[in-house]
Amino acid sequence: MNGTGSVGHRWNSLSPEPHSGTESTASTPFVKSEFPFDDDLFGIDQVNNVKPHPMDMPCNLPIQPIEYNRRFSKDADHSTFVKNEIEENILNFNVNPEIAQDNGLDTQQIDIYRDLILRHLIQDISTTCAKLGLPNDFYLWSSEHGARWINEMCMQFNLQPPRNCSITGIDLLGMSQKDFEMILPAGGDTLHAQLQVWKTGTSDYVKAFENYHPPVTVQSSGMTAAENNMQSKTNWLASTNNQTNNMAAAENPNHPFFNGNGGYPNMSMSSFFQQGTVLPSPSNSDTSSNGSSQDMNDDDIDLHMNNSNCGFSNFFHNQGYMNSPIDAMCNGSEGDDDERAYTRHQGTVHLWQFIRELLDQPKQYSACVRWVDRDEGTFKIESSLLLARYWGQRKNRSQMNYDKLSRSLRQYYKKGIIQKPEKKQRLVYKFLPPYNL
C-alpha cells in the first residue's frame, strides 16, 4: 500500500501542524502532541532530576518522646496544682503560693466578720438589758433582776419558766450546767449556754483586739477597690485597739467576771464597763471606696465625736432602748416633766432610740409620734416640726430641722433598722426586727 492510498488506510495527525491552520494529509509514523513542549515549563531531560516534596522526604531526625498535656486529664478534685505549661513545660505538684496567699486573705476576712458578729451580740445584750431594766453589771443584779433574765431567756427559747426563782447576778455567774438543770430540768442546758454567750459578748471582744497592732493608714495609689475596702475595715478595727488596751486592772479580785471563759480572771465586770470605751458601729465607720464620707449624717457624726467621752457602760445602755417602763417601775416613779426625755440620759443617743423613747410615752408625746401597730413596729410621725424640735433639744442643736432629721431616717433604710411599710403612707415607718421588740 502506497502513501496515496485510500483515506481509510491513512493516519492523519491529531492536531494541526505548528504555525499552520490546515490539517496535515501526510501520513506520519508517530502521534504528535496537542501543543509543543515548553522547555521553560517542563524539561523532558529533567524528569529524572525532579526534587522530592518535603513531605515525601524520609525522616532522619531522632524520635522525640511525645508529651501529653495532662492538664485536662487530671481529676477535678486532685489536691495538687499544675502550673501553666506555657510558662514551664513541667508538671508541678506543689501547692501554688498564690493560693496560700489567697487563703490568708480569707482568714483575715473571717476574723473581721467574726468581730462584726460579736458587735451585734453586744448590741443584742444591751438591748435586752435596756428592755428588762437590768444593770450593766452582773454583780449589781438583784434576785429580781436574775428572775427577769431567766424569764426572758425562757420566753425566747419557748421554755417553761421556773417558779419562785430568785437568783442574784453573782449566783448566776457561779452556776454550772447541773445547777441550771436543777431549777429547770427541761432547759437548764439552754440557759447555761445562753449565759456563756452573754459572757462571750464581752470577754471575747476584748481578747480579739488584745494583741492587735494598728497598721499604717497610708494607702498606695494602685490599691484596688476590694483592697481599699479591706483596708478601711482593718483601720476600723485598729481604731478600737487603743481603747481596749487602756482597761484598768481588777477592782474586786474576789469576783472574777471572765473566769468562766479563761480571760481576764482579775477583772470584775463593773471595772470592765467603767473603764472601757464605746466602739463605733461598723456601718457608721465604713465609707465609700473612693474615701468620701458624704453618706455620714448628723446621727453618725455625733457617734464619732463622742466616742472618746462615752464609757462602755453607756454603749451598753445606749445601743439598746431607752429606759423602759419596767426600768421606771424599778426606780420607783415615772416623771411627768417633758424635759425628762431629754436630760435623763448621758452620752450619745441615736435617732431611732429617741423615737422609741417617745413612742413608749404616749401620754406626753402622742401629738408628736405614735404607734400605728405596736406588734408590727409601725409608727407615724404626727408632727415632723415638733419631732425635729424635740430632737434638736436632745442634741442641743438649735438649727435642727426635719430635713436634717429625715436624712438620718433614710440612712436607717440601708442599716436595716427602719423601712417604709408595704402600704406606703406619708410619715409612716416600720421598725425591723429586732428593733421592733
From Swiss-Prot:
GO aspect biological process, one term: cell differentiation
UniProt-listed SUPFAM superfamilies: SAM/Pointed domain, Winged helix' DNA-binding domain
Protein family per UniProt: Belongs to the ETS family.
Annotated protein name in UniProt: Transcription factor ets-4
Gene Ontology cellular component annotations, sorted alphabetically: nucleus; RNA polymerase II transcription regulator complex
Modified residues (Phosphoserine): 73
Effect the entry attributes to changing residue 83 to A: Abolishes sumoylation. Suppresses axon regeneration defect in mxl-1 mutant background
Effect of inactivating the gene: Delayed larval development and increased lifespan, but overall resulting animals have normal morphology and fecundity. Reduced egg-laying rate, but older hermaphrodites produce more progeny. Both decreased expression of genes, such as the lipoprotein vit-5, which is related to life span regulation, and increased expression of genes such as lys-7, which is a lysosomal protein. Reduced expression of genes such as svh-2 in response to axon injury and as a result, there is reduced axon regeneration of D-type motor neurons.
Subunit structure: May interact with cebp-1. May interact with tdpt-1 to facilitate its sumoylation.
Domain PNT, residue spans: 120-202
Region ranges (Disordered): 1-30, 275-302
Pfam family, one: SAM_PNT
Function of the molecule: Transcription factor which binds to 5'-GGAA/T-3' DNA consensus sequences. Both positively and negatively regulates the expression of target genes. Plays a role in the regulation of adult lifespan, which may in part be through modulation of daf-16 activity. Regulates the expression of genes such as svh-2 in response to axon injury and in addition, may function downstream of the cAMP signaling pathway to promote axon regeneration.
Claim: GTP-binding is one of the keywords in the record: no
Modification after translation: Phosphorylation is required for axon regeneration. Sumoylated; sumoylation inhibits phosphorylation, which is required for probable interaction with cebp-1 and consequently the expression of svh-2.
Per UniProt, location of the Glycyl lysine isopeptide (Lys-Gly) (interchain with G-Cter in SUMO) cross-link in this chain: 32, 83
Annotated effect of mutating residue 73 to A: Abolishes phosphorylation
InterPro entries, per the entry: Ets_dom, ETS_fam, Pointed_dom, SAM/pointed_sf, WH-like_DNA-bd_sf, WH_DNA-bd_sf
DNA-binding region: 349-432
Annotated GO MF terms: DNA-binding transcription factor activity, RNA polymerase II-specific; DNA-binding transcription factor binding; RNA polymerase II cis-regulatory region sequence-specific DNA binding
Subcellular location: Nucleus
Tissue: Expressed in cells of the anterior and posterior bulbs of the pharynx, seam cells, a few unidentified cells of the vulva, the hypodermis, several unidentified neurons, labial socket cells of the head and rectal cells.
Keywords: Activator, DNA-binding, Isopeptide bond, Nucleus, Phosphoprotein, Repressor, Transcription, Transcription regulation, Ubl conjugation
